[in-house]
Regions:
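Phosphate-coordinating catalytic segments in nucleotide- and nucleic-acid-processing enzymes
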Residues: 5-7, 48-327, 398-435
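Switch/communication elements of ASCE P-loop NTPase nucleotide-binding domains
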Residues: 1-51, 291-426, 430
Length: 435
């Protein structure tokens, strides 16, 4: 089982955070201490590193397709000279190219479709030149295709296409070999629409090996991070919407690479019992709605259920669809929000069981002493305390920065920090008598 260390320094409210994730990690802190910011960046790093090679390939594929799409306007313009079947064949080939991935044919299949598209262009261009009488229009089209002389159509198209594909392939292979950290930064900004700059001081280690170096390391044992945000939170951040969209996809769709794991059905039964019902799929025209079906026969769409229910429903569907595995990092932000104290303990028990059953690594941010206490003692009961960590975000005196203190398994400082709120309450009572 791999161990991870994640560090951010001097970024927004975070003064220093150096956390370890081996099983379950709990980060405790007040609102505004930067714990959600840290979770978000960990999510970005894991999900970008784990599919970096696929990103390299998709960029290569997309630029090849774009190089062909630029001819579409010209083909539409000269369509009266063209065979409709040939134009449809060209468009269909471009459509097939968009579906090529690193895992289903890669460069070889893309090269095959590219040559097919170029051959189709060659045929259509020859057709056009045989019929077009306007020399200006002929020269205009030849210039677009990079053809020097009308009688050099085949040679020029072949030479130009080979050169173009070779240049883009060389860039793809260069990126794949060198894995520049600048590419990671650009991808995070683009994919997650992250407006804030990349942290100047950030580190991510797998089994003590630093991965965020000039030549990015490969992540071996994690292939997916899943983020469940605070149920009642409303965010205007575009990056938060991207995270929510990714979660929604997994809640709806089955992980084709998932497998049946012993204990899965027991967990699903436990969650159904907790929510006193089940989640069913109901067809809605060409879409599928997820509906909470209570044991007393009431149906509610999951977007309309109580916010405290939602983390439980999300986890139920993630388990059903095979997304929670030993290669998954589950990040859950303040899951206790809007939950009755008894449910907090039940939820903590569920999270510990997920870790034990699937080997899923879990990062929990919280400011609830019941959640912290429940995770601590249930982990011990389940024999998982040696891989459970607790951190407390403490504000540096006279600053807006928070430093994350490693508590190990000693959660007493957490309760001491919560006692400060009671001290504040006592001052109000002393000053005003009643509230």
């Amino acid at each position: 089982m791999s161990k991870y260390k994640f560090n951010i320094d001097n970024y927004h409210a975070i003064g220093h955070a150096d956390i370890e994730i081996e099983g379950i990690t709990v980060i405790v802190g007040s609102n505004g201490c930067g714990k959600s910011t840290m979770s978000r960046w960990l999510y970005y790093i894991v999900n970008t590193l784990s599919v970096l090679d696929s990103f390299f390939f998709s960029d290569f594929r997309d630029v090849i397709i774009k190089s062909l799409e630029k001819y579409s306007n010209a083909l539409d313009d000269i369509s009266n000279y063209l065979d409709d079947d040939k134009k449809r064949f060209f468009d269909h080939t471009l459509s097939l190219m968009t579906m090529v991935t690193l895992s289903n044919g890669g460069v070889e299949k893309l090269d095959f479709y590219y040559k097919r598209a170029i051959g189709s262009l060659d045929d259509m261009l020859v057709n056009f030149l045989q019929k077009e009488q306007n020399p200006q229009q002929v020269r205009r089209v030849l210039n677009l295709f990079g053809i020097t002389e009308q009688n050099h159509v085949h040679e020029d198209i072949e030479r130009n296409s080979i050169q173009l594909f070779s240049e883009y392939l060389q860039k793809y292979e260069h990126n794949k070999k060198n894995r520049p950290i600048s590419y990671l930064k650009e991808k995070i900004a683009a994919v997650y629409r992250e407006k804030d700059g990349f942290p100047a001081s950030i580190s991510f280690k797998e089994d003590e090996v630093e991965l965020l170096v000039d030549r990015l390391g490969k992540i071996y044992s994690l292939n997916n991070a899943i983020y469940i945000g605070t149920p009642a939170a409303i965010s205007l951040r575009q990056s938060d919407r991207v995270l929510m969209t990714s979660l929604a996809h997994k809640v709806v769709h089955v992980n084709e690479k998932g497998s049946e794991i012993t204990g899965k059905q027991e967990l699903l039964h436990s969650i159904n019992k907790m929510i006193d019902g089940s989640i069913v799929e109901k067809e809605n025209f060409d879409a599928v709605d997820l509906v909470y079906h209570s044991n007393n026969g009431k149906d509610i769409r999951i977007e309309d259920i109580a916010s405290g229910f939602k983390p439980l429903v999300y986890m139920l569907r993630l388990i059903e669809n095979g997304w929670l595995t030993e290669n998954t990092l589950l990040e859950i932000d303040e899951p206790e929000t809007n939950l009755h104290p008894q449910w907090v303990v039940e939820l903590a028990h569920l999270l510990v069981r997920i870790n034990k059953t699937f080997g899923t690594k879990i990062l929990i941010t919280s400011h609830n002493p019941d959640m912290v206490s429940a995770i601590r003692y249930i982990s011990e009961k389940e024999g998982l305390l040696n891989t459970t960590r607790f951190y407390l975000a403490e504000q540096s005196e006279g600053t807006d920065s928070f430093y994350y203190k490693n508590l190990g398994c000693d959660i007493e400082p957490v309760f001491e920090s919560f006692n400060k709120s009671f001290d504040t309450l006592q001052k109000y009572v002393e000053n005003y008598g009643e509230i």
